[in-house]
């Protein structure tokens, strides 16, 4: 089916090489102010032809609003978004219309609908995900304004290249990065002439992602785009974390969420990995470019963190929160698996280790500037923002410094800044000291961050010739033509973020329809 949701329904329509694609949101609340620029920003993060790492199909993905708004406020009527397909090349698929492509849906599509697809993957194409990004980017604005709930996804690994385990725990358990930080730290500059990479801290690497020392490469021979270097120690190339906190907003405050457009040089190409670990981002770029030259593809893992979800959403038994999220995330092309919290690693733990102990939230807010964080053992503690940085500074790799979001980052919640809602005078709002459950117990949200990881298979369209059978049983050689990604991971985070917001939004309305808004407490409320 092309519709998701019970009360908040999203229907997508259109084909990859048709005239347009789009979506209809039905059941959305009225009088919600929507920033269309934020929707377009998410579409831009997903669109193809962002860099040499992605498909060169040149789609602008400009949002067209057809209905549901009076200026920028919702009417409560169906919202209709449209996105025109501008770079259509159906002829790329003419040569193999009678050959089901390995790894694609051509064969199963034909067996179900008795139609041979003449224009790529049609409804099964990743092109469809642009519609859910538009819908989700609209819904998530309501989630943030009403519940202070925000969602961030990022690339954890590509192939066997992954964020170091210690840093991964830091991001999942302590301080989830903002989207701007993901895009900033995930940006890598590539000099095709010199065959070198440069990360966001101006560290230079060769084509194998090996860092070059200053005496091995003379930076003075390069025209380096100027970024705010006030927090970079030139001698050690290390980062002053406190200064990063102060300068972060200026650092990412530009059109592309990376570096200032006016400072870009023709010598440099900007590659976006959406991996919030600079060194790993460079490794990913090197790996994908090599695979692209070989005509092959690769998959990986994407992490998603739903911050401050309302407590009590999820419908046991068959509409559990993780079941609904899994249904939605697995509907994204190329996603083949999902795990929550400790996931499969939890199978190696004892129950005494895995059980998440409850504590009153009020016990976590005894200091004026204390933050709700998790220590190295995964236990929730009251920790000063900067003291946490100091305690971990010697333990974290140099390339991971600066991960703490600034105190004024809207995605970083201070527990003392919000009103905690209690059910009544006797029952207290609780939180778990650890989060092995991933923010979900018995299919219902606990209020802790919901953490899950998605397994992404390699893109099926590759430029390597393979022997396969046509529809008539004749063996033949096939080399897929067209414009395709070698790795879909850099474009995936906004899709996962949008898909998650659709699920959370629908479950909130289902809960409200039964018990009213007063039964939806959150750990952190907007003032």
UniProtKB/Swiss-Prot annotation:
Keyword field:
Amino-acid biosynthesis, Aromatic amino acid biosynthesis, Cytoplasm, Lyase, Oxidoreductase
**Record EC number:** 1.5.1.38, 4.2.3.5
Q: Which GO terms describe its molecular function?
A: chorismate synthase activity; FMN binding
Q: Record's GO cellular component, any one?
A: cytosol
Pfam families per the UniProt record, alphabetical: Chorismate_synt (PF01264)
Which reaction does this chain catalyze?
5-O-(1-carboxyvinyl)-3-phosphoshikimate = chorismate + phosphate; FMNH2 + NADP(+) = FMN + NADPH + 2 H(+)
Gene name as annotated:
CS
Segments spanning the bilayer are none
Location of the active site: 17, 104, 485
**Which InterPro entries does this chain map to?**
Chorismate_synth, Chorismate_synth_AroC_sf
Q: Give its localization.
A: Cytoplasm, Cytosol
Pathway involvement of the protein, from the record:
Metabolic intermediate biosynthesis; chorismate biosynthesis; chorismate from D-erythrose 4-phosphate and phosphoenolpyruvate: step 7/7
Q: Which Gene3D superfamilies match?
A: Chorismate synthase AroC
Q: Which domain of life is it from?
A: Eukaryota
Recorded family membership: Belongs to the chorismate synthase family.
Which protein is depicted? Chorismate synthase
């Amino acid at each position: 089916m092309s519709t998701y949701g019970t009360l908040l329904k999203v229907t997508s329509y259109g084909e990859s090489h048709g005239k347009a694609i789009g979506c209809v949101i039905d059941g959305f609340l009225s009088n919600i102010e929507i920033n269309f620029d934020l929707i377009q920003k998410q579409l831009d993060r997903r669109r193809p032809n962002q860099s040499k790492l992605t498909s060169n199909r040149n789609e602008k993905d400009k949002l067209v609003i057809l209905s549901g708004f009076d200026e920028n406020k919702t009417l409560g009527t169906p919202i209709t978004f449209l996105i025109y397909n501008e770079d259509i090349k159906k002829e790329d698929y003419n040569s193999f219309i009678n050959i089901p492509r390995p790894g694609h849906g051509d064969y199963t599509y034909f067996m179900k609908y008795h139609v041979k697809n003449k224009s790529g993957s049609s409804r099964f194409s990743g092109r469809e995900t642009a519609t859910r990004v538009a819908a989700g980017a609209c819904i998530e604005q309501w989630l943030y304004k009403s519940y202070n709930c925000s969602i961030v996804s990022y690339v954890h690994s590509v192939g066997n290249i992954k964020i170091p385990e210690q840093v991964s725990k830091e991001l999942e358990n302590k301080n989830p990065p903002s989207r701007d930080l993901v895009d900033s730290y995930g940006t890598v500059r590539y000099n095709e002439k010199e065959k070198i990479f440069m990360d966001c801290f101006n560290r230079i690497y060769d084509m194998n992602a090996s860092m070059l020392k200053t005496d091995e490469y003379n930076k003075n021979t390069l025209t380096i785009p100027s970024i705010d270097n006030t927090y970079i120690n030139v001698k050690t190339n290390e980062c002053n974390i406190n200064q990063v906190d102060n300068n972060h907003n200026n650092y990412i405050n530009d059109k592309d969420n990376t570096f200032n457009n006016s400072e870009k040089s023709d010598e440099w190409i900007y590659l976006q990995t959406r991996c919030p670990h600079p060194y790993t981002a460079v490794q990913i770029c090197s790996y994908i470019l090599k695979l692209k030259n070989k005509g092959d593809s690769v998959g990986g893992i994407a992490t998603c963190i739903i911050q401050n979800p309302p407590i009590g959403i999820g419908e046991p038994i068959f509409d559990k929160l993780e079941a609904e999220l899994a249904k939605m995330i697995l509907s994204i092309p190329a996603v083949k698996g999902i795990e929550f919290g400790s996931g499969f690693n939890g199978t190696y733990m004892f129950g005494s280790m895995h059980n998440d102990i409850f504590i009153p939230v009020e016990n976590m807010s005894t200091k004026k500037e204390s933050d709700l964080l998790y220590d190295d053992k995964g236990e929730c503690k009251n920790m000063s923002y900067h003291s946490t940085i100091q305690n971990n500074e010697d333990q974290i790799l140099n390339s991971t410094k600066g991960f703490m979001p600034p105190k004024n980052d809207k995605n970083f919640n201070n527990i003392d800044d919000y009103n905690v809602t209690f059910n009544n005078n006797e029952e207290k709002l609780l939180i778990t000291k650890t989060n092995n459950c991933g923010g979900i117990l018995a299919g219902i949200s606990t209020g802790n961050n919901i953490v899950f990881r998605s397994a992404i298979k390699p893109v099926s369209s590759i430029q390597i010739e393979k022997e396969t059978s046509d529809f008539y049983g004749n063996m033949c050689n096939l080399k897929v033509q067209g414009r395709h990604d070698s790795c879909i991971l850099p474009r995936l985070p906004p899709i996962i973020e949008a898909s998650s917001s659709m699920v959370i939004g629908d479950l909130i309305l289902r809960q409200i329809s039964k018990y009213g808004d007063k039964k939806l407490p959150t750990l952190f409320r907007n003032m």
